[in-house]
Amino acid sequence: MNKTAIKNFAIWARNKLIADVSYDARLIGITEDGIAKPLPQSFGGTQFFDIGTAEPYSISGEAVRQRDKLIEVIQQKEKDTDYKTAYQYVIEEVAYTWFNCLIAIRFMEVNDYLPSHIRVLSSESGKLEPDLVTTPFDAELPFTAEEEAQIFQLKQDNKLDEVFRILFLKQCNALNEILPALFEKTKNYTELLLSLSVIDQDGVVYHLIHDIPEDDFNIERGGQVEIIGWLYQYYNTEPKAAAFAKNGKITKEEIPAVTQLFTPDWIVRYMVENSLGRLWLEGHPDCGLKENWKYYLEEAQQEPEVQAKLAEIRKEYAALNPEDIKLIDPCMGSGHILVYAFDVLMQIYESAGYSQRDAAKSILEHNIYGLDIDDRAYQLAYFAVMMKARQYNRRILNGENTCHVYAIQESNSINRAHLKYFGAGMDDIEKNAAKMQLEGLLDTLTDAKEYGSILNVESYNCCLLYTSPSPRDMRRS
């Protein structure tokens, strides 16, 4: 893996994406200095903005609604800080959203994991024009008649970047059906700030394809899904340095960048083999797996009394089935430990007679759990675990699958005045009990993005909370 190329690309791509997103925001009157109102000549569903050229910039229809949502998001963030910081936070958020989508699609297309089996960012023949742009209607993406006509006309006019933008958004929305935690529906303000080119050799897409060797993504040629984690760590290089350089208090927003550290492979293997691996070997010493584990340490000689206690423990472990094992990484980052744990669990399942296809589904459902305070790291951990499952089960993305990795959320923005509506339709005893439980949970999760997994979350009656009807439920009935 060429980590120098990966690092150089990630750092450069972050700055490039932020610059591009900021430029697109400026076109619609949104800058770090403030939000401009549309020009007076705006009418109906069309808005005009002064960008210093002879003709004003205009948006209409859905783009107007997307701009309104973008303003709403910035103003909501501004409640916790100042406008400039809120603006920078949202611009950074949009930039990393598209960065995550780009590197995920690159991994999927190189490994032929895309449902259409048609490359989105590159061409198998090496031409500049991506295969999806060449044959857009072979990918089985949903198009309206109007969209098909638009694509035909744009291709005829040789406006490849405009064709690519339409198709890229279509592909992201299609991937939402199989990987919803990473590929969000793009009919929001992030779509308004998307400016990608496939023909510009100074663009992010061109550099992604040409700067990082394709084999680094290809798992059949020595590549690993862990490249996603390395890209994310290097993406945070400059924010991390800036946070440390100010020599002051680290803000909540800066914690993910300054604490993100991609664990070296040998440490991951050592930890997993001597925890998860040892757990299984204690009860199944003849499974023959430890020969595959380079960093597994044999147990030291113990005193007779200790040996007797260990023998009792081994009896319990001997009754374990693979589905009984639960492994959690409470600060999972981009999922490096979980990905290797998936490999070890696969070996355990196979030693117990499972097929790779059944084992992959069971590992997702029963074995692997993860938490992180960083929403973007969570997205990549989710993606990495799902791609590892896809490696063993080519149909895993065809159906609904539960992946137990989560981003810790805090309760700061929840309006507790709304609790008076909670539990409508319940008797007073149940309603008060549910309300007390919910208030306790909200108290615990205050500033959870700062504390993360060190929080001590008490046991709650989840069945009561989940079944408590809300005002929306009552309206439905």
Regions found by a protein language model. Name each.
Residues M1-G283, M386-E410:
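Non-catalytic, mostly N-terminal accessory regions of nucleic-acid modification and defense proteins
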Residues N247-S468, R472, S477:
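SAM-dependent methyltransferase catalytic region
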